[in-house]
């Protein structure tokens, strides 16, 4: 795999994390820079690990991974999205935003990275250095997620609760689209 292909793959795998991070940054209103870096690190590490898991599983587990990844992604993203929507509509003004919970951050990172596991399975059939590819995916996702949080910060300063509701709907929609895509394929 050429260096250009590795970079293209890495940034392609980070798009979901970027979109979710923009929503999280907006929902938090004014996330600190340390929160953006922490979010980027969590998304980056999870996004780097999942293709390695898929690569290791290879052919033996490909049918299992493909059979359940869409259900796992839908369940995680739908739960987090509905929880954010609920919090945006019914939380008290001084309540802590849902997105600051590490559990929510981790569930969202896992939900957006399950497709990377399937990519990892396909990489098992190619002559690639999985460490290089996984590192590139992790770094790209770190940059995109951290940047997404900071972009979302600008939006959230003006639209806090609305942004949290939209982010919740977007997460649910992302999970639903993953589920529909796999069920109709």
Curated annotation (Swiss-Prot):
Intracellular or extracellular location(s): Cell inner membrane
The molecular function terms in GO held by this entry are: manganese ion transmembrane transporter activity
The alphabetized UniProt keywords are:
Cell inner membrane, Cell membrane, Ion transport, Manganese, Membrane, Transmembrane, Transmembrane helix, Transport
Primary location class? membrane
* Keyword Isomerase annotated: no
- Identify the Pfam families for this entry: Mntp (PF02659)
UniProt keyword annotation of Transport present: yes
- GO CC terms in record: plasma membrane
Membrane topology classification: Multi-pass membrane protein
Transmembrane residue ranges: 3-23, 41-61, 70-90, 101-121, 123-143, 165-185
Stored InterPro entries? Mntp/YtaF, Put_MntP
Query: What family does this chain come from, according to its entry?
Result: Belongs to the MntP (TC 9.B.29) family.
Functional note:
Probably functions as a manganese efflux pump.
Q: Which PANTHER family match?
A: MANGANESE EFFLUX PUMP MNTP-RELATED
- What's this protein's name? Putative manganese efflux pump MntP
User: Which gene codes for it?
Assistant: mntP
């Amino acid at each position: 795999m050429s260096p250009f292909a590795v970079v293209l793959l890495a940034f392609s795998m980070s798009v979901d994390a970027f979109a979710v991070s923009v929503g999280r940054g907006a929902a938090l209103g004014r996330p600190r820079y340390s929160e953006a870096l922490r979010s980027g690190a969590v998304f980056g590490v999870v996004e780097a690990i999942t293709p390695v898991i898929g690569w290791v599983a290879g052919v033996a587990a490909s049918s299992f991974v493909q059979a359940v990844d869409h259900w796992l992604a839908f369940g995680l993203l739908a739960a987090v999205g509905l929880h954010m929507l609920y919090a945006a509509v019914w939380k008290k003004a001084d309540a802590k935003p849902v997105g600051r919970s590490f559990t929510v951050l981790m569930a969202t990172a896992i939900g957006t990275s399950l497709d990377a596991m399937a990519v990892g399975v396909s990489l098992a059939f190619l002559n690639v250095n999985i460490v290089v590819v996984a590192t590139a995916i992790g770094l790209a996702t770190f940059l995109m997620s951290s940047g997404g949080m900071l972009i979302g910060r600008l939006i959230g300063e003006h639209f806090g609760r609305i942004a949290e509701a939209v982010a919740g709907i977007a997460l649910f929609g992302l999970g639903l689209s993953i589920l529909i895509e796999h069920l109709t394929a």
